[in-house]
């Protein structure tokens, strides 16, 4: 039997999840699977009929996690479950949904195909970022999308010295710097004019945010190296910069802090129904292949 124990995880404080979660749980039970409900999801919904499990318990016992929400929900769950190797499938109950690629209305059909063995598993790399103050480790966290260094809300530009494996790359003045995985190349990095990276690439991309020099451009580097960014100037206020991990956890930065970023030891395992295509997702989400329409209206 494929995936005998299935965990259901919903977006935090989403008030519209009760009915679709119950329907999925009933469908899974009818298919002979044991259903667990994430503890936070159970607290935030009225779905109390099934065994409740913490994220750690899900990691230790579940064979599949079904995540209902947006991409942000999947990011958080993926970081928690990656060390356990539990695969997850995303049901889109958010907006854009690059990672939660299954529409809510198709959830039952897609899950039925997966339970029947018609699925593929995709390994997605994570980043591990650490903040150092002298020799002291101040903060460390993983990220599926990106690690972002940026100026504080009241601060000006920040300046950082960037090295790869101890080799000097450049010094940059900008509002920020995005270090993104292939998964993250469709997120914040894309809005900052970064390139799209195929998820099969073993690479990460550095994308400047509003750089002072117009010659600054994104650069793709191998995922085997260790990036080292030293904060050499901050703008106008003492706590003028911060490091963000998937924009969900963060650390304040001080002048002279050093931030290291490298590939994390674990991967996120994403389950897709057989026939999934990254390019199909791009076409749908970015509206490729839609030709301009001729209009007689004066704009």
From Swiss-Prot:
Cofactor: a divalent metal cation
Enzyme Commission code: 2.7.1.23
Active site: 71 (proton acceptor)
InterPro entries tied to this protein: ATP-NAD_kinase_N, ATP-NAD_kinase_PpnK-typ_C, NAD/diacylglycerol_kinase_sf, NADK
A GO molecular-function descriptor: NAD binding
GO annotation, cellular component aspect: cytoplasm
EC top class, as a word: transferase
Keyword RNA-binding in annotation: no
Main location: cytoplasm
Cited Pfam families: NAD_kinase, NAD_kinase_C
GO biological process per UniProt: NAD metabolic process; NADP biosynthetic process
Residues spanning the signal sequence: none
Keyword Cytoplasm carried by entry: yes
Record field: catalytic activity: NAD(+) + ATP = ADP + NADP(+) + H(+)
Cell location: Cytoplasm
Residue sites binding NAD(+) per the record: 71-72, 145-146, 173, 175, 186-191, 210, 248
Keywords in alphabetical order: ATP-binding, Cytoplasm, Kinase, NAD, NADP, Nucleotide-binding, Transferase
Family: Belongs to the NAD kinase family.
PANTHER family in alphabetical order: NAD KINASE
HAMAP family per the UniProt record, alphabetical: NAD_kinase
Function: Involved in the regulation of the intracellular balance of NAD and NADP, and is a key enzyme in the biosynthesis of NADP. Catalyzes specifically the phosphorylation on 2'-hydroxyl of the adenosine moiety of NAD to yield NADP.
Name under which the protein is recorded: NAD kinase
Gene it is expressed from: nadK
